[in-house]
């Protein structure tokens, strides 16, 4: 015989799981919310692999980055507000312009978007 407390605990656990699941949203890849997730991953990657980014910059001096990204890398507080307003094309250019985009950044961005319940559609 199953106790009512067991059933109640099971229902509560299911309800908590449903409440904790993020809502899903489908957005354009150029949506600012998508860009902010991408830039958050990018800033974290720069922090984790700073020497690699310095070497890339030295080898490609014509590659420029928005000043907001540099400020966010070295500001260890909440940097997301610094990154608003960067045009989507510029976000795409800087993120996809590094050789490790497909092996390290793209999977991390996909994971972060999915974790936030965001899916993108083609423009």
UniProtKB/Swiss-Prot annotation:
Q: Which GO biological process entries does UniProt record here? A: fungal-type cell wall organization
The record's section on InterPro entries has: SRP1_TIP1, Yeast_SRP1/TIP1_CWP
Write out the entry's keywords from A to Z.
Answer: Signal
Q: Which PROSITE patterns match?
A: SRP1_TIP1 (PS00724)
Give one Pfam family: SRP1_TIP1
**Annotated transmembrane regions:** none
Which molecular-function annotation in GO is an example for this chain?
structural constituent of cell wall
Say if the entry is tagged with keyword Signal. Answer: yes
User: Which positions make up the signal peptide?
Assistant: 1-20
Q: What are the coiled-coil residue ranges?
A: none
A single GO cellular-component term from the record reads: fungal-type cell wall
Similarity-based family: Belongs to the SRP1/TIP1 family. Seripauperin subfamily.
PANTHER family given in the database record: CELL WALL PROTEIN CWP1-RELATED, SERIPAUPERIN
- UniProt name for this protein: Seripauperin-16
Specify the species: Saccharomyces cerevisiae (strain ATCC 204508 / S288c) (Baker's yeast)
Instruction: State the taxonomy lineage.
Output: Eukaryota, Fungi, Dikarya, Ascomycota, Saccharomycotina
Gene encoding it?
Answer: PAU16
